[in-house]
Every structure is written in structure tokens, then in C-alpha cells.
């Protein structure tokens, strides 16, 4: 293509994504848009086409982002090229959303006509505004009997401050209003800015590993043009590769000769290691590099850590391979090897949040058929010592000796919880029980309130979300952002079995709830550990102080069975002999902790 053709083509490109709260109908709308633009034959069409992972289809949530190129003939008779980038809606995957928004010029904001605006909708709108996107409000599900589009329109204006007078009323399920949405995209979303003659700048917004072609980078071209055979350089790592293919997704991968400004597509360059294509990095030409990388987005830091161990220790290497493969597509997953006396060899993994953690575990068990034990999730603590040093602790067993600790700080989050009036009391109770500090309360309309709390991340990690949903009958929606570290009275609690510490059961807990938590765990272990030939004490300790204890009684043989009546001294002798034996056994005996006991303690909640 020459320069004029490229410029004409560029003016016809529209890049947009769809943002919404979970279940407001984002994936269904994407399906209808694909159908309307004839991207697929009727036969290929299936519900939630862009959610390609089994897990996504099963849970009905979008986890990974996806991109498609569509051709649309507008009412003005011109052919437009639309790039739809699908995004997840769940709080743990906000990062996936921010990546896809960075590759767009516009966003369709889908709001449920019955439920109105929810916490995640707001969080994503702010992300879109940060990226200066043109936002087109769409009120979806207007065919529901409980729909109230006028109220929702008012809500969009009041809460977000967008002009909703031209908001499209649609029903993705029934296919109402889809054409109006497409016309608005063509009309209101700006064409990509950028110059095809400038040095190449492509942003990587995702990557995927293909066993035959190596790493495939999903890119959005911001400036310049990239063709097969070009030598390209990754600006973050400085590594160079030769491009073997470029193309676009029409959901299927379709090869093209070149990608130019505004194109969203893929690039393969027989890259072996996914670490070389960091998400958010800029690709440029090796011969004529760009002066500086694009304002990439931040490196994502995991918030929640836990240990993953294979139940069958022989499968340690398989687990490593599984984690490496998942890491290829999941830039936020981090892991490093770790060993535990109780569980053997495994990995310490970092995740964005609890849903992310669950999904990774489920994918390992499903796709790689490895059974896992997971230790209790923990967060990163900063520990300041009396000698002036500070240590970062992401694993309770690395906590320094209590005598040498000056203070401990833990991460706090600002949680915004949207909830109907009737449940405000219940939500406040949960937040206070989780050591939350009340910050603010705002009424969105007559029926809904936003509560803002500062809560320690370690309390949210545990079972906050489940409690929130069950105590508000599922009506509360919840979003959080990290605000930094604050000092807390935290202690490390160890569990001793027969006076030996079990490292996998150590955890860090707030001093006020330490006693209760210790007591519950000790009782639970007493039920689950089988009786031994000797008496086994179970203790919960903080430093050298035992805060809770319980004892598993010994099994014993009736040594007096052979005595018919007879003298007490004879019986004494036999009983004392038995006692001696038990004592000796206790000093050398070791106690195996069964799998169920670990699982039960890790799953235990605070009540």
C-alpha cells in the first residue's frame, strides 16, 4: 500500500472495547455485533464466542481479553474496519481491562436496564476516562420485565456524569438496537491518530504461546508499518527477532502482508521465551528504532500469595511446566520454587486476587491433570526490625523472631461497596469484623448506597467476598484498590504437633483474634489427626507462648487381660511397664498429618 491508501484506510478504522459489570451482557453484545457484521457463518456462531476457555464458558465470565477485526458497511455507504477488543469484568482482572482500553479510542459502556450501575462499571469507566476514550453508553436488557431504562439513564448522568440523552436502548439477547450501536461507533469514535511513515511503535497487549510458531504477540500498531521479514526489537528487553507472520483476527487468525497504523492484530517471530514479549512493551524496527517506547502500562504486582504443592511429589516437574505454560498467557502470575517439611517440594505463587488464584488452580487441575494442595493465602508484609533493617515477608514461615521485630506493616485497600439500603447494616458489620475503618457513605439514589472502607488486604483475601455476597443475598458489588501500607499488631502463629512445628500450618494473624483462631484450629486438628499409640499434644503458639492446646489421647492395649484376679503389685508392674514403653515411643515417634487435616485448616473461616 502507498501512503495515500494507508491514510484513507486509517480514517476508516474504529477501535473500541466493551466495558460492563459482570453479567450485564457484554459477551452477548459482542456475539450480536459479530453476527451483524457477518464475521461468521451461522454454523460457526455459538454463544459467548469470544470466551474461548472452557472455564470462561462454564462460569459465564470473561477472563482473557480477545480481539476481532470486523468489516461494517455503514449507512453512509462507506466500508469501515472495526476492531472489537473484548474485556473481562471481574475485579481481579481489572488489569486485563486496562490493557485492552489502552489499545482503543472508544468504549461501549453496557449498563443493565434492571440493575443499573454497579461498582465494577464505575471502576472500568474511570479506567476508560483515564485513557481519554470516547464513551458510548448502552442500556442493555430493555426486554426484561423489570427494566427501567429511564431510571438507569438518569443514574448514568448522575453517578458517572456522562450525557446519556443519546444512549442506545438495546437488548443484546433479542438483537434490538445493535445497528444503532454500530452507527454510533462509526460516528463518534475517533479514527486512530498516528503516522504510517514514522518509526514503528506497536504495543503488546497480550501474548499467547503456540507450540509450532513460538510466542504470538497481540499488538496494536500506533505508528509505522510492520511486514513479514522485518527485523524488530523489543524495547524493554532489547532482544531482536525476525517477523515470520503478521495478521488479524476475524475471530480466526488470518495472515496479512502488513499491519499499519490503527491495526489490531498479531505478530509471530519465532520467539521461544514468553519473557521476551512482556505485555505493555513496545515493538520497534531494529534498523530504525523509535526514540522512546509508548507510555506502557504499569508492571502488575501480585497481591495474594499461596503455596502450590503436588499431592504426588513425583509430579513436581509437571507442575513447573504447567505454571510456565500458564505464565505465557498470564502476565500477572508469578512463581518461585519453595520447600516445606510437611508438604515437600512446591511453588510459592503470586496472584492478583482470590478469583485469579482459584482459576489458576482449577486450570492446573483440569488442563494438566495435577492434583494440588494449596496453603492458606497470604499477602506481603513489611517487617521493621529493632536493628533498623526491614524485611519483606510473603510467606509466614519467613517471619523473623518476635523479639527482634520493632513493628509490622500490612497492605490496606480502599474498598467501595455498592449495596441496596436494606443491607447497609449487614455490610457495615462484616467490614467492622474485618478490622475495616469507615471512610464514607454516599447515596446514589433512593435505594442504593456506596460505602467506602479501608480494610487490610489480608482480611479480604480470606472469605470477605463470600460473606459479602451471602449476607446481602448477592446484591452487593465490590471493588478495591491498594492504598499502601499501615502498621498493625500482627503476630505469627505456629502449630506444634508433639512439640514439633508444622511449617505449612503457620499463619500471620492480628493479635486480637489470635486466641480464637488458635483454639479453633487446635480443636479441628484434634478431630482429624488419627489417634497414635502415644499421647499427642497439639499446641498453637505465638513466639514461646502457648495460646491454645488440646491433646489426642493414646490408644492402649489392655495389658491386664491375662491377670486372673491376683495381687495389685503384679498389675502395677505391668501397667508401669506399659507406661515406660509409651514414654519411649513418644520421644521417638513422629506424627503424620493427613491430607484432610491440611485442607480443613486451610479452608477454615473466621467464625
From Swiss-Prot:
It is found in: Cell membrane. It catalyses: GTP + H2O = GDP + phosphate + H(+). Keywords: Cell membrane, GTP-binding, Hydrolase, Membrane, Nucleotide-binding, Protein biosynthesis. One of its GO terms (cellular component) is plasma membrane. Its EC number is 3.6.5.n1. Its main location: membrane. GTP binds at residues 23-28, 140-143. GO terms for biological process: positive regulation of translation. PROSITE patterns: G_TR_1 (PS00301), G_TR_2 (PS51722). The keyword Protein biosynthesis applies. Residues 11-193 form the tr-type G domain. InterPro entries: EF-4, EFG_III/V, EFG_V-like, EFTu-like_2, G_TR_CS, LepA_C_sf, LepA_CTD, LepA_IV. It comes from the Bacteria. One of its GO terms (molecular function) is ribosome binding. Coiled coil: none annotated. It is an enzyme of class 3 (hydrolase). It is a peripheral membrane protein. HAMAP family: LepA. Belongs to the TRAFAC class translation factor GTPase superfamily. Classic translation factor GTPase family. LepA subfamily. Required for accurate and efficient protein synthesis under certain stress conditions. May act as a fidelity factor of the translation reaction, by catalyzing a one-codon backward translocation of tRNAs on improperly translocated ribosomes. Back-translocation proceeds from a post-translocation (POST) complex to a pre-translocation (PRE) complex, thus giving elongation factor G a second chance to translocate the tRNAs correctly. Binds to ribosomes in a GTP-dependent manner. This is Elongation factor 4. It comes from Bacillus cereus (strain B4264). The lineage of its organism: Bacteria, Bacillati, Bacillota, Bacilli, Bacillales.
Amino acid at each position: 500500500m502507498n501512503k495515500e491508501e494507508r491514510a484513507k484506510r486509517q480514517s476508516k478504522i474504529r477501535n473500541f472495547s466493551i466495558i460492563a459489570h459482570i453479567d450485564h451482557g457484554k459477551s452477548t453484545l459482542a456475539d450480536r455485533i459479530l453476527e451483524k457484521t457477518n464475521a461468521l457463518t451461522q454454523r460457526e456462531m455459538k454463544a459467548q464466542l469470544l470466551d474461548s476457555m472452557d472455564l470462561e464458558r462454564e462460569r459465564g465470565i470473561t477472563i482473557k481479553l480477545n480481539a476481532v477485526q470486523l468489516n461494517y458497511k455503514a449507512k453512509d455507504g462507506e466500508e469501515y474496519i472495526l476492531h472489537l477488543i473484548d474485556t473481562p469484568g471481574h475485579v481481579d482482572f481489572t488489569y486485563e481491562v486496562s490493557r485492552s482500553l489502552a489499545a482503543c479510542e472508544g468504549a461501549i459502556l453496557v449498563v443493565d436496564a434492571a440493575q443499573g450501575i454497579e461498582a465494577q462499571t464505575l471502576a472500568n469507566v474511570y479506567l476508560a476516562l483515564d485513557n481519554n476514550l470516547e464513551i458510548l453508553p448502552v442500556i442493555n436488557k430493555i426486554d426484561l420485565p423489570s427494566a427501567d431504562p429511564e431510571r438507569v439513564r438518569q443514574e448514568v448522568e448522575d453517578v458517572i456524569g456522562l450525557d446519556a440523552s443519546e444512549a442506545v436502548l438495546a437488548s443484546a439477547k433479542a438483537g434490538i438496537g445493535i445497528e444503532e450501536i454500530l452507527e454510533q461507533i462509526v460516528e463518534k469514535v475517533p479514527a486512530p491518530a498516528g503516522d504510517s511513515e514514522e518509526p514503528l511503535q506497536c504495543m503488546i497487549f497480550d501474548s499467547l504461546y503456540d507450540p509450532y510458531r513460538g510466542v504470538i504477540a497481540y499488538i496494536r500498531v500506533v505508528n509505522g508499518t510492520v511486514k513479514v521479514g522485518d527485523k524488530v526489537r523489543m524495547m524493554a528487553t532489547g532482544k531482536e527477532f525476525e517477523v515470520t507472520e503478521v495478521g488479524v483476527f476475524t475471530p480466526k487468525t488470518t495472515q496479512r502482508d502488513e499491519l499499519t497504523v490503527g491495526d489490531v492484530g498479531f505478530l509471530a517471530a519465532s520467539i521461544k521465551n514468553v519473557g521476551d514479549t512482556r505485555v505493555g512493551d513496545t515493538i520497534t524496527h531494529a534498523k530504525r528504532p523509535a526514540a522512546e517506547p509508548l507510555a506502557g502500562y504499569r508492571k502488575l504486582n501480585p497481591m495474594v500469595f499461596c503455596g502450590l504443592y503436588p499431592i504426588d511429589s513425583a509430579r513436581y516437574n509437571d507442575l513447573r511446566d504447567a505454571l510456565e505454560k500458564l505464565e505465557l498467557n498470564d502476565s500477572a502470575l508469578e512463581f518461585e520454587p519453595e520447600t516445606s517439611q510437611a508438604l515437600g517440594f512446591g511453588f510459592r505463587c503470586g496472584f492478583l486476587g482470590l478469583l485469579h488464584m482459584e482459576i489458576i488452580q482449577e486450570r492446573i487441575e483440569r488442563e494438566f491433570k495435577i492434583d494440588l494442595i494449596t496453603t492458606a493465602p497470604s499477602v506481603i508484609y513489611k517487617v521493621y526490625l529493632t536493628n533498623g533493617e526491614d524485611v519483606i515477608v510473603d510467606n509466614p514461615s519467613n517471619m523473623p523472631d518476635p523479639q527482634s521485630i520493632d513493628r509490622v506493616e500490612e497492605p490496606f485497600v480502599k474498598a467501595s461497596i455498592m449495596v441496596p439500603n436494606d443491607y447497609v447494616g449487614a455490610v457495615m458489620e462484616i467490614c467492622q469484623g474485618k478490622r475495616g475503618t469507615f471512610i464514607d457513605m454516599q447515596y446514589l439514589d433512593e435505594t442504593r448506597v456506596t460505602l467506602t472502607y479501608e480494610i487490610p488486604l489480608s482480611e479480604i483475601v480470606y472469605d470477605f467476598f463470600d460473606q459479602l455476597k451471602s449476607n446481602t443475598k448477592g446484591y452487593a458489588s465490590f471493588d478495591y484498590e491498594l492504598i499502601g501500607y499501615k502498621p498493625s499488631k500482627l503476630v505469627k502463629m505456629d502449630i506444634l504437633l508433639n512439640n514439633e512445628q508444622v511449617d505449612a500450618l503457620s499463619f500471620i494473624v492480628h493479635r486480637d483474634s489470635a486466641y480464637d483462631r488458635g483454639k479453633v484450629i487446635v480443636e479441628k486438628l484434634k478431630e482429624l489427626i488419627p489417634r497414635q499409640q502415644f499421647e499427642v499434644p497439639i499446641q498453637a503458639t505465638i513466639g514461646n507462648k502457648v495460646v491454645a492446646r488440646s491433646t489426642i489421647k493414646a490408644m492402649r492395649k489392655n495389658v491386664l487381660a491375662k491377670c486372673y484376679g491376683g495381687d495389685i503389685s503384679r498389675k502395677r508392674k505391668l501397667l508401669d511397664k506399659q507406661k515406660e514403653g509409651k514414654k519411649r515411643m513418644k520421644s521417638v515417634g513422629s506424627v503424620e498429618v493427613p491430607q484432610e487435616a491440611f485442607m480443613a485448616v486451610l479452608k477454615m473461616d473466621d467464625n
